[in-house]
C-alpha cells in the first residue's frame, strides 16, 4: 500500500524531471556563430584606482569595518605595484575595541582609530599566454526585466588566450588600533599583578584594561594571475566580453616593530572622583607579541574604464600573541582605469 509520504515524494520527483526536460528542450538552445572582435590579454589598462565604500574584517585584535582607497599600476610586462589604505568610518561603525574601550575602560589610555596602510610590488617571474576557453552568457535585449529573471541563461564556450603571471611579491604593512588587553590576558594566562609600575606594585584587580597597538612590517610571497581580455560578436545575441583580471596570492608576514602603549591608571575615591596624585604608569611588557604570520587571498577586477572589484583574504597577522587571526572582505565601486597613453601619430601634409 502506498502511503501519503511516498505519494508526495513521487509527485515531487516527477515535477523535477519535467522541469529538467523542459529546460533541456528550450527552443532557443541552438548553435550560435560568432566573430572575434579582439583577444589581447596583454592590452590592459595600466592604472586602476579603487574606491572602497565598504570593507569588513573579523580580526581577533579588533573587529572593524569601514572604507578604503586602493591603486594599482602595471609597468609593461615586468612589474606591477599596489598601494592600499583603509580605516573605520567611526567607533560605532565599526571599530569594536575602540567603542568598547570608551564604554567600559578603567584606564586613562587614549583610544586609537584603526588605520591600515599597505604598499608593495610584484615582479613577473614568468609572464606568458596559453590557449584556453571562457564561458560567455548569451543575452538578448528582449530578455530585459522579468524575462531575464525567469530563465536560466544559456552560455557558450569561446576559445581564447589567457595570460598567466607567476609573481614574486614584496611590500610593507603599517597599521595601528585600539585593543582589548583583558582578552589578551585570558589568552596568555596573565593576571593584573603581572603589570608593574616603577615601584614594583601590580595593577589592582578588577580594572578593565585597553591599550593601543602599532605595527610596522614586511610581507614576502608569491602570486598567480590570470588575465583574459576577449570580446566576440554573436549572430543573434549581444556582444560577449570576458576581461577579468584574477589574482591569488600567499604571503609570509613579518613585523619586527610591534609596540603596545603602557597602561596609565588613576584610582578613584569612594565618591568615584579620580585621585590624580596616585596616577601611575604600568609596564605592558608582560604581554607577548607574535612577529610572524601569513595570509592567503584572492582579488578580481575588470579591464574597463569604469567597473567594480572584489577581494578577500584570511590568515594570521603579527599582533598580540593569540590574537592574530583575521578574515577580510572588501568591495570596490567605482573602479576607474586608464592606459595613460593618449598620444597619436601625426604626419605633415
Task: Report the location of each language-model feature.
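Residues that define the transmembrane beta-barrel architecture of outer-membrane proteins
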Residues: 45-47, 61-67, 111-119, 164, ...
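Outer-membrane beta-barrel biogenesis signature
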Residues: 22-48, 130-161, 234-243, 338-349
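Glycine- and aromatic-enriched membrane insertion/assembly motifs of diderm outer-membrane
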Residues: 62-128, 252-257
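Repeated loop/turn-to-beta-strand initiation elements of outer-membrane beta-barrel proteins
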Residues: 77-83, 127-132, 230-232, 303-311, ...
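Transmembrane beta-strands of outer-membrane beta-barrel proteins
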Residues: 48-54, 82-86, 133-140, 166-173, ...
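Short glycine/proline- and aromatic-enriched beta-strand/turn motifs that initiate or cap beta-hairpins
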Residues: 23-89, 175-182, 334-336, 349
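Outer-membrane beta-barrel transmembrane domain signature
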Residues: 31-33, 173-310, 316-320, 333
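Outer-membrane beta-barrel "beta-signal"
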Residues: 116-130, 323-349
Amino acid at each position: 500500500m502506498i502511503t501519503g509520504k511516498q505519494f508526495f515524494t513521487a509527485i515531487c520527483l516527477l515535477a523535477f524531471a519535467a522541469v529538467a526536460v523542459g529546460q533541456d528542450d528550450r527552443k532557443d538552445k541552438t548553435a550560435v556563430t560568432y566573430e572575434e572582435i579582439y583577444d589581447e590579454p596583454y592590452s590592459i589598462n595600466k592604472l586602476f584606482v579603487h574606491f572602497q565604500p565598504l570593507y569588513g574584517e573579523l580580526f581577533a585584535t579588533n573587529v572593524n569595518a569601514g572604507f578604503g582607497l586602493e591603486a594599482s599600476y602595471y609597468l609593461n610586462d615586468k612589474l606591477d605595484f599596489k598601494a592600499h589604505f583603509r580605516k573605520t568610518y567611526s567607533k560605532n561603525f565599526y571599530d569594536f575595541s575602540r567603542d568598547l574601550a570608551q564604554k567600559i575602560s578603567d584606564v586613562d589610555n587614549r583610544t586609537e582609530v584603526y588605520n591600515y596602510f599597505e604598499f608593495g610590488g610584484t615582479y613577473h617571474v614568468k609572464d606568458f599566454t596559453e590557449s584556453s576557453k571562457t564561458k560567455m552568457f548569451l543575452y538578448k535585449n528582449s530578455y530585459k526585466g522579468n524575462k531575464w529573471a525567469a530563465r536560466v541563461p544559456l552560455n557558450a564556450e569561446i576559445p581564447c588566450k589567457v595570460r598567466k603571471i607567476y609573481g614574486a611579491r614584496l611590500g610593507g604593512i603599517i597599521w595601528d588600533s585600539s585593543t582589548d588587553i583583558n582578552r589578551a590576558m585570558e589568552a596568555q594566562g596573565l593576571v593584573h599583578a603581572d603589570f608593574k609600575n616603577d615601584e614594583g606594585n601590580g595593577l589592582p584587580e578588577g580594572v578593565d584594561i585597553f591599550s593601543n597597538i602599532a605595527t610596522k612590517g614586511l610581507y614576502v610571497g608569491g602570486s598567480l594571475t590570470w588575465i583574459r581580455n576577449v570580446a566576440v560578436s554573436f549572430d543573434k545575441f549581444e556582444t560577449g566580453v570576458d576581461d577579468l583580471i584574477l589574482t591569488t596570492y600567499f604571503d609570509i608576514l613579518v613585523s619586527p616593530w610591534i609596540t603596545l602603549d603602557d597602561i596609565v591608571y588613576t584610582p578613584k575615591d569612594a565618591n568615584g572622583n579620580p585621585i590624580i596624585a596616585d596616577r601611575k604608569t604600568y609596564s605592558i611588557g608582560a604581554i607577548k607579541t607574535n612577529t610572524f604570520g601569513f595570509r592567503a587571498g584572492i582579488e578580481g577586477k575588470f579591464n574597463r574604464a569604469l567597473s567594480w572589484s572584489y577581494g578577500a583574504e584570511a590568515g594570521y597577522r603579527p599582533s598580540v600573541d593569540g590574537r592574530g587571526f583575521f578574515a577580510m572582505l572588501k568591495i570596490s565601486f567605482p573602479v576607474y582605469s586608464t592606459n595613460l597613453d593618449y598620444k597619436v601619430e601625426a604626419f605633415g601634409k
